[in-house]
Amino acid sequence: MQSVQSTSFCLRKQCLCLTFLLLHLLGQVAATQRCPPQCPGRCPATPPTCAPGVRAVLDGCSCCLVCARQRGESCSDLEPCDESSGLYCDRSADPSNQTGICTAVEGDNCVFDGVIYRSGEKFQPSCKFQCTCRDGQIGCVPRCQLDVLLPEPNCPAPRKVEVPGECCEKWICGPDEEDSLGGLTLAAYRPEATLGVEVSDSSVNCIEQTTEWTACSKSCGMGFSTRVTNRNRQCEMLKQTRLCMVRPCEQEPEQPTDKKGKKCLRTKKSLKAIHLQFKNCTSLHTYKPRFCGVCSDGRCCTPHNTKTIQAEFQCSPGQIVKKPVMVIGTCTCHTNCPKNNEAFLQELELKTTRGKM
């Protein structure tokens, strides 16, 4: 009898030890998924190489670029889900609320060419497009860059032609042999994509195409960026332009950050409200914009997340115009710098020196 009690006591003791060991290991794993008190001193020099259709996003700690986690994959603060695909990190199964599984936000399904897609699901109707179902709405982006990069303005009668053996078409200049562009004037129009609705409105059959905004034309001071989109009732590819300012030219490059050991200051917010200016126009309202900082180790910082607002400008007495303006959310620092990055830093330093003199 005493032997049985002794054996039972040892088993209970072993179970308690295993339980404490398991809790300790879980605590260590959870700790690796939390945001550190401060970002690591160095992120990878090059952006991560993600699978086709997967975006590179800032981790949940806003430190480094990572590949967005997809549906069914594990997620955490350091490995965020692809929110643009309607995904969120479901942490209900983790008592510590540190890790989870990327799950689609409940939404309506989509129907495309007779096929039903769930909200958050990605698909390719052809080799030219990557589409995503978002709560009953289908959004598509082109896989062919030439499909949205329009020819130069001096290109007479531009038209697209198919290339044998290739998926993507290409632009050529010159009059059409049949003297009719036909459907080529609507580069994004696809009569077969009816989504099961028989109507004459061309916008219903339009696969949305919108490029990313180009880099700002100036490294400092007010410049402009462009994109091409067919988000209009005619489904026509139109060029859009917005004002942008990555940083003011009087920013000091020799002091990129106030934190000891840091070589870059990614994002810096203006301490005082300022009027935006371009040419002879001044904004009616003041703003406290965010700017991208500079690095002391040769890297350059560029906008990562941006949005566009409509700002009112007064260009002459009584003349008020509205202009789209880029607003910076976050910036990222990397080594993929423009060729004139060194000259840009020298220009900043020269202007700063003159200002001090």
Curated annotation (Swiss-Prot):
Organism in which the protein naturally occurs: Homo sapiens
Q: Which InterPro entries match?
A: CCN (IPR050941), Cys_knot_C (IPR006207), Glyco_hormone_CN (IPR006208), Growth_fac_rcpt_cys_sf (IPR009030), IGFBP-like (IPR000867), IGFBP_CNN (IPR012395), Insulin_GF-bd_Cys-rich_CS (IPR017891), TSP1_CCN (IPR043973)
List GO BP terms, alphabetically: angiogenesis; bone regeneration; cell adhesion; cell adhesion mediated by integrin; cell chemotaxis; chondrocyte differentiation; endothelial cell chemotaxis; endothelial cell-cell adhesion
Q: What gene makes this protein?
A: CCN3
List the PROSITE patterns.
CTCK_1 (PS01185), CTCK_2 (PS01225), IGFBP_N_1 (PS00222), IGFBP_N_2 (PS51323), TSP1 (PS50092), VWFC_1 (PS01208), VWFC_2 (PS50184)
Output the Gene Ontology terms for molecular function. Answer: growth factor activity; heparin binding; hormone activity; integrin binding; Notch binding
Does the keyword section mention Zinc? no
Lipid linkage positions (S-palmitoyl cysteine): C244
Q: Which SUPFAM superfamilies match?
A: FnI-like domain (SSF57603), Growth factor receptor domain (SSF57184), TSP-1 type 1 repeat (SSF82895)
Keywords from UniProt, A to Z, are:
Cell junction, Cytoplasm, Disulfide bond, Gap junction, Glycoprotein, Growth factor, Hormone, Lipoprotein, Palmitate, Secreted, Signal
Q: In which tissues is it expressed?
A: Expressed in endothelial cells (at protein level). Expressed in bone marrow and thymic cells.
PTM: May be palmitoylated on Cys-244, which is important for extracellular secretion.
Q: Give the residue range of the signal peptide.
A: 1-31
Name where it's found: Secreted; Cytoplasm; Cell junction, Gap junction
**Residue span, IGFBP N-terminal domain:** 32-105
Report the domain of life of the source organism. Eukaryota
Q: What is its main location?
A: secreted
Q: What induces it?
A: Expression is down-regulated by WT1. Expression is down-regulated by pro-inflammatory stimuli such as TNF or IL1B. Expression is induced by laminar shear stress and statins.
Glycosylated positions are N97, N280
- All copies of domain VWFC, residue ranges: 108-174
The TSP type-1 domain covers: 205-250
All disulfide bonds of the chain are C35-C61, C39-C63, C43-C64, C50-C67, C75-C89, C81-C102, C264-C301, C281-C315, C292-C331, C295-C333, C300-C337
Gene Ontology cellular-component annotations: cytoplasm; cytosol; extracellular matrix; extracellular region; extracellular space; gap junction; intracellular membrane-bounded organelle
This protein's name:
CCN family member 3
